[in-house]
Amino acid sequence: MKKQILQLNLEQTSSAAAEDTNLDCSLAGYDYVLPPERIAQNPAVPRDSSRLLVVNSQTTGKETPPLHQIFRDLPDILRPGDLLIMNNTKVIPARLYGRKSSGAEVEILLLEERKFNCWLALVKPGKRFKKGTQIIFEGLGMRNLGIENSPQYSVASPHQLTATVLETDKATGGRLLQFDLPEGQSLVQLLDKFGEIPLPPYITTSQAADEQYQTVYAEEPGAIAAPTAGLHFTPELLQKLRDRNINQAFITLHVGVGTFRPVEVEDVATHQMHEEWIEVPAATVAQIKATKAAGGRIIAVGTTVVRALEGAAASGNLQEFCGKTNLFIYPGYKWQVVEGLITNFHLPRSSLLMLVSALIGRERLLNIYQEAIASQYRFYSFGDAMLILPEARGVEQ
């Protein structure tokens, strides 16, 4: 069946829930103080040894506190017949270092390929990169070892890359770069030699290897950040889940730079969400519908999966989808597909924090975050996880 290629423009304008309506729509309502030492600089080893905070009741308080478990306990927490939906995107080595013809050093972050070997990129420093500026990139082997000693290079690989600035992108402030390569050769094929895996800006002292910032099921190159809720899974844990009839299905959402950008408008309902490319294949749609028909539950692994599934169901009916979405989920959103969520702990004032608030309520989520901080949980991309079970969500607004 030919895939339906669509362009979603799904800025949600639903009203917030009656309780705490003003704060639900106020940027200040999503603030909290995180001690810097709670920001994880390195991942848990092994992956599934990270902690898991489980929210499994409609209220959270002294009588019904969240459970504190280990991620590898997941097969005993979920039910046979549940379905985990995972994002199989793969982080590309999107950070490149180069220089202008004047010798001035340049750092760029590739955002997306607009057409063959023509990329939108953030450039630092960016003020003087006008149309026609040329940038020269040297491979990591040349920069670190000397090209003749680098095992990363084959005879067919170029020693340098050049790119020309075509224009400034007003929406992102980035530059459109045309890379000059031999006919038929793709920049993506050379990124392992010329680029580095970009880590989030709050990770400053990490010793993690590149593969530790990839999920074990990453297959589709295109992201500039990992879908971090999936970093906790190991092949052995996935097999244990399958052995208990807790199966997995996949979507693809290439995580973009917007995931790190804070919401800046005071009225969050007016926030303009960034676009991200998603694919929800027919096989995944079929698995979801079969799971629901059999009484199983749909558990999203990460906020990227939430956006993909809910975006694909924007018409009211989940369907195969391939295209872009700028879906913004915040309190008051009417859920279509997702019933439970595995997610890491998110930054204050972020759209991701608002998304999770839409599932269980803003005030309640912030109270859970305070308990996580007091209990020494590790936050953000390399941090611990939380599981919101369907029975924790309460009555839909």
Swiss-Prot record:
InterPro entries (UniProt xref): QueA, QueA_dom1, QueA_dom2, QueA_sf
Record-level GO BP terms: queuosine biosynthetic process; tRNA wobble guanine modification
One function term, GO molecular function aspect: S-adenosylmethionine:tRNA ribosyltransferase-isomerase activity
Domain of life (superkingdom): Bacteria
The protein's annotated pathway: tRNA modification; tRNA-queuosine biosynthesis
Keywords, ordered alphabetically: Cytoplasm, Queuosine biosynthesis, S-adenosyl-L-methionine, Transferase
EC number: 2.4.99.17
GO cellular component, one term: cytoplasm
Gene3D superfamilies in alphabetical order: QueA-like
Swiss-Prot/TrEMBL catalytic activity: 7-aminomethyl-7-carbaguanosine(34) in tRNA + S-adenosyl-L-methionine = epoxyqueuosine(34) in tRNA + adenine + L-methionine + 2 H(+)
Presence of the UniProt keyword Cell division in the record: no
Subcellular localization(s) per the UniProt record: Cytoplasm
Main localisation: cytoplasm
Quaternary structure (record): Monomer.
Family: Belongs to the QueA family.
Name the record gives this protein: S-adenosylmethionine:tRNA ribosyltransferase-isomerase
Organism: Nostoc sp. (strain PCC 7120 / SAG 25.82 / UTEX 2576)
Gene: queA
